[in-house]
Every structure is written in structure tokens, then in C-alpha cells.
Amino acid sequence: MELLYVCLVCVFVFLVSLLLLYKKKSGEGLPPGKTGWPVFGESLEFLSSGWKGHPEKFIFDRVAKYSSSVFKTHLLGEEAAVFCGASANKFLFSNENKLVQAWWPNSVNKVFPSSTQTSSKEEAIKMRKMLPNFFKPEALQRYVGIMDHITQRHFATGWENKEQVVVFPLTKRYTFWLACRLFLSVEDPKHVAKFADPFDVLASGLISIPIDLPGTPFNRAIKASNFIRKELVRIIKQRKIDLGEGKVSSTQDILSHMLLTCDENGKFLGDLDIADKILGLLIGGHDTASSACSFIVKYLAELPHIYQRVYTEQMEIAKSKGPGELLRWEDIQKMKYSWNVACEVLRLAPPLQGAFREALSDFMFNGFYIPKGWKIYWSANSTHKREEFFPDPEKFDPSRFEGSGPAPYTFVPFGGGPRMCPGKEYARLEILVFMHHLVKRFKFEKIIPHEKIIVNPMPIPANGLPLRLYPHHHNP
């Protein structure tokens, strides 16, 4: 009897221990929040806040409700914690590939199948080997003239001799043309146009519910990616021939560099791998920049005093150039106020709304337990539109970026840490060259004064930002 009693006590202690362990793993110590509907979680609320033009509402409502800068939810089929604020940004960016790693939804992995064959850390190392020189400021200097030339052609064909234009399709064409030229040395407008339409279909369905049925955005995105990939493989095969025959330079663009770079074992990437990586770069170098350029036009149209200061700065540079003389790196460095304006646009309408990470192990943050495998979402708006980081956050004020600028980890349109966008300086160049030729040629006004903004996944004007143009009476 006594032995039975001891056994029962041992079983009871064991069961209590299991229960306590289960509680820790399944809820106790987790951030506050709810997981929403089965399967969908809170994904529809998360996405619909963007469709309504206020993606920050999903974040701010829950921060206020739970009185916490960390909360749990269920997004895109995954249990997730949302991290908000500068300290959260610092924690995530500082622990990249230690406690967390980049994570993409299944829709992205299915569009880029090669990304599932290696770890996120290995992919990051590969890409940084592939792009050691192209995006460095000293390397980008030699591309300023090419950017200037293409930008002039863009305005000549898409803007000049028109009373009205729709801005967003034009900025998409502009940034895509630049990316094709500088990444692939593809410059023929007909060849670029062949990529452009399927590329738009791909971008719009990339972050979507991964239902692969005919007619769904995800299904259309997969078809578009397959078409683009075949075209890229054709370009890659021809480039290999041209490199072998010495017809092209080994350093003329990213494609040549990728073809000639091997890993530590002497292995070169296959054609499909390179096509996937070029495709990813085209998305990063095209969609985000086109959104940024469109919103720069929007704010310049709404704020005449800001436009006038940008115009004055750019005309001083224009007047220093001889007939037909292209912009140079030194001219870009003089565009300080223009870049402050661009940064304020990136604060108020960041093309990158946020990004996901995956917990590599259990860890604690702000007193909360984050289990291994959970997804973590950081939001740019959690600092960009908070009074404590940017006083009067809805006010357009480029002076925020004068001197030392915003506090660390508060202005994050390009991410941060090891995963910071490698094309940050490239984006600065294409944005400033665009601003130079825009204000040098035109004054303009919005045709729809209160046009709705949609965020899906980047902010875009619902009607494309129709504009009425008033050309300046001087030679551009």
C-alpha cells in the first residue's frame, strides 16, 4: 500500500511537471494577443488595414489594447509576434542569424523555388558574395551618367508634350527600365516592355494567400514568374556565349558578375538559380523605388513651398552644366535638401512596410517568451509614425533629417543590420536623378485632390496619381 502511495505521488508530480511545461510552451509568458480565426488568423485584418490605406492601424490598435510593444497574432498561416519600436528594431537587427533569420511566406517560396533549397543565412552569404562591388558608392559613381541618360529618355517619351499623365505606371516603367539596363544591360524599350506586364502581375501576387487556383493572384504570379524566368534563362545563356567570345565586359553589370563568381568549393550557380536571384533583385530595385518616386510627386504637388526649395536646389545644379552634359556623382552630393525631402516621404509612405523573421531558438524579449519557429514581424510604421520618435508625426517636415538626423533604429525604410537593403545607395541615386528631371521640367498639380492610398504590399495611389503638367519655359 505504501509503495502504491509513493508511485501515485511520483505520477502526480510527473503529471504536474508536464502540465507546467506545457503551459510555458503553449501560452504562459507569451506576449498578449489573440490568434483570430482558424487558418486565416488575423491575416484578413492585417491585409485589409493596408487596403484601406492605413496599415499602421492594425499595429497601433493592438499596441494600445494590450499596452505592450510586443503582441502575438496569427498571420499568413503562421503563429507570430509583432515587435514594435526602436528597441525592438535594435534587438532584431542585432540578432540576425543568431536568434532570428529572414523568413518569407509560402507564396514567396513557391514563386522562388530555389530559395527553399538553402538556409536563409546561406542565401544571404551567397548574395553578399555576388554583389560586393556593384552597390558600393564608389562603384555606383560610374553609373550616374547612364541613369541620367535613361531618365532623360524616360521624360522625353513619357511626360513631355502631354497635358496630363498618370504617375504610378510611369514611375514603374522608369525604375524597371533602369533596373533592366543596369542589372542585365537590356536597354531596348521593346525588350523591356516584354518583361514589364508579367512583372507587374508577379509583384501584385507575390504577398498573397497561396491558393494556386486559376484566376487567383497567386496563380497568376506563378505563371508570370515562370514566363520571366524563361526569358532570363535565355538572356543568361546568350551572355555566357558573349563572355566566352569576349564581346562583353566581365564587370558591366550584375549578371556578368554572377556568372563569373563561384563559391568556396569552386562551384558556379546554375542558370535557374541566377534567374531567381536576378528576379528578386528586379523586384527590389523596381517596385519599391517606383512607389517612392510616386509619393515624392504626390507630396511635391501638395506642398508648393517644399517644391520651390527642391526646384531652387536642382536648378542651381542644372545651370552649372554645359549643353548635353550629364549629371555626375558630385552633382548628386549637392542634392541635400532634395534627399531630406525624399527621406521624409520614405518615413510617411515607406515602400517596405515591414518584414518577417523566424525565431531560431526560444528566447525572451521585454519579459515575453518567444518560442523557436515563431514568426516575428517588425513594422516601419511602429517608429515612423510615433510621436515619441517623430514629433507631430503626420506633419511633412524634411528638417527632421538635417544634422545627425533621427535617432538610431527609428528611421528604417531600408531595414537594418546584416539584412539592410544592399541597394540603398542605388535607390538614392535613381530617386534623386528622377527628382532632378521632374522639377526641372514641370510644375504640376493633382487631378484627384484626395485620392485614396492602398497598401498591397507597398503604398500606391488608388487611381495611379493623375497629374496635370505645367512645363517650365526653358530648355530642359
Curated annotation (Swiss-Prot):
Top-rank taxon: Eukaryota
Classification via InterPro entries: Cyt_P450 (IPR001128), Cyt_P450_CS (IPR017972), Cyt_P450_E_grp-I (IPR002401), Cyt_P450_sf (IPR036396)
Membrane-spanning intervals of the chain: 2-22
Pfam family, one: p450
Key words, A-Z: Heme, Iron, Membrane, Metal-binding, Monooxygenase, Oxidoreductase, Transmembrane, Transmembrane helix
Binding site for heme: 421
CDD domains to which the protein is assigned, alphabetical: CYP90-like
Presence of keyword Metal-binding: yes
Catalytic activity from the UniProt record: beta-amyrin + 3 reduced [NADPH--hemoprotein reductase] + 3 O2 = oleanolate + 3 oxidized [NADPH--hemoprotein reductase] + 4 H2O + 4 H(+)
GO molecular function, one term: heme binding
Subcellular location: Membrane
PANTHER family: BETA-AMYRIN 28-MONOOXYGENASE, CYTOCHROME P450 26
Annotated family: Belongs to the cytochrome P450 family.
Protein name as annotated: Beta-amyrin 28-monooxygenase
Organism listed in the record: Solanum lycopersicum (Tomato)
Lineage: Eukaryota, Viridiplantae, Streptophyta, Embryophyta, Tracheophyta
UniProt gene name: CYP716A44
